[in-house]
Amino acid sequence: MNLQNNQGKFSKEQFSKERFCQLEDEQVIEMVHVGDSDALDYLITKYRNFVRAKARSYFLIGADREDIVQEGMIGLYKSIRDFREDKLTSFKAFAELCITRQIITAIKTATRQKHIPLNSYVSLDKPIYDEESDRTLLDVISGAKVMNPEELIINQEEFDDIELKMGELLSDLERKVLALYLDGRSYQEISEELNRHVKSIDNALQRVKRKLEKYLELREISL
């Protein structure tokens, strides 16, 4: 009985694959939108490994790897649901954006709920060089050039990635200093709380800047 069921399932999967594999993803999505459940199953199966590959880039303290994958699958489903032909991008690019955003949103929500201090994200709009400067982490990443909408989307993904990697880049002292600084503390207040000289606080923030710039350079080379 089980063998017959498995054979039937296999035949259905084969039929679905043969039915859709010659079509563009955008055509399959049109079929999903008119209620074709086989078309939905086909896209979910097709992109499952893509989701797993994206999930490997992220981590969440206290969570299983499959939790991240499941969030990615939710993002994939949303991309299928929300994609429209008039979008000026391919479905795969749109799906990647939705998957990444879903994973990042889940991680940020979880870290806030667990009250984990700056283990994975920081504000990119806070001045970083010194208290008299209005230059921010955002400026370091984007530079002075005027960005078009497509570049803004790409850079937003970069920002999210940097936020999640920040905990790996910085030392314990640098994370503490940056967390307090982003919380609005002055150099003097940070030095008193951490029992460090003001110069040590300034040096820590300078190292944060250099590490971030180095990371961005290496990331650019690898792309």
UniProtKB/Swiss-Prot annotation:
GO BP: any one term: sporulation resulting in formation of a cellular spore
Domain of life: Bacteria
Location of the DNA-binding region in this protein: 187-206
Motif Polymerase core binding boundaries: 67-80
Purpose of the protein: Sigma factors are initiation factors that promote the attachment of RNA polymerase to specific initiation sites and are then released. This sigma factor is involved in the transition to post-exponential phase in the beginning of sporulation.
Stated family: Belongs to the sigma-70 factor family.
Protein name from the UniProt record: RNA polymerase sigma-H factor
